[in-house]
């Protein structure tokens, strides 16, 4: 009997090696990475020169009242690898890697607790010819859209995950609405992608998933180091 591993966060190298050794798949549950919207967006941007992007995901945590009352919920604990970057910032990072590939370098500055865990922060991903600005937050809520800047105009997304709308506005003000069909549930397309991979294995695509996951976590590590975010397991 074969078993497949679904990892909600932190797809580690040793898990990847274990999966390969046992001839099974390991999937990281980064739901926006598998949205069909990103294929549509990437195809639309293919003939355009990118000048930069602003991606954000900040949502006030239901655990904030506990934190303010003096408790340390898991999402704000260095023992459980918590914080805004790890919990929500991973979605803008996956979007950037999905659309533009791995950045050359990254940095992150944050509002932090005494245990070094970030409540919110701003990061920059450095590509050869442009930068992607990242905002993540768990003690704030952002209602800002996400934008991708090109030489021809700006592509505006209503959000960075479970995308409903993508509208390109050129420098003359003319607009084009991309054919985005929002899935009925945030995890619908992710689950469908995993099921298809199991039923109809595609090793090339699977390796691309793993490589992109590795790129995301290398960037996360670099960003944490620049902000001084330290997890208990690393001490």
Regions found by a protein language model. Give the residues of each.
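Contiguous beta-strand/loop segments that form the cofactor/metal-binding neighborhood of enzyme cores
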Residues: 92-164, 191-201
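Structured beta->alpha junctions
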Residues: 4, 30-33, 57, 112, ...
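Active-site loop of classical SDR/Rossmann-like NAD(P)-dependent oxidoreductases
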Residues: 181-192, 208
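A short glycine-threonine-serine/GTX helix/turn-capping micro-motif
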Residues: 79-86, 176-185
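A general structural signal for well-ordered alpha-helical segments in protein cores
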Residues: 12, 38, 92-93, 187-195, ...
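Predominantly a Rossmann-like dinucleotide-binding segment in NAD(P)-dependent oxidoreductases
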Residues: 32-104
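Beta-strand-loop-alpha-helix segment that lines the small-molecule cofactor/substrate pocket
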Residues: 1-33
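C-terminal helix-rich "cap/oligomerization" subdomain common to oxidoreductases
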Residues: 21, 193-235
